[in-house]
């Protein structure tokens, strides 16, 4: 279970870490994750940190040095930037895994690759040897999510049945 700790302080989430033994956390902003999950917290408690918010190309280096997994790879330009950063290796790279974010509801206000462009993005990632371990989506708000979850399952099975699915809801 990925615990989304956005808008919570380290003090707020310490009971999750200490008492409930949660080790898998999601953050939607790099700056907030940096302040909350300092190196001592990550190493002392063996925290695995996932980026679940949009990633700007100018922040790729920072994200690769902080998050174990980036769940919001959603466009070819971002894949190019990730690949370039990994090739340069000017800093310790923490990120080992990536998810492709799918705009499953085709909503213009949301990030994510469109369904009909997913295969091309997936192939590009494989060409660059990025370890794609799953697909991520956030279904439209205020509607029954099941049809979107089913569509993601079909997409995953068509693309690669071994991929994981991360299908979150804010409400």
Question: Predicted segment positions?
Answer:
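Conserved alpha/beta-domain cores
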Residues: 1-171
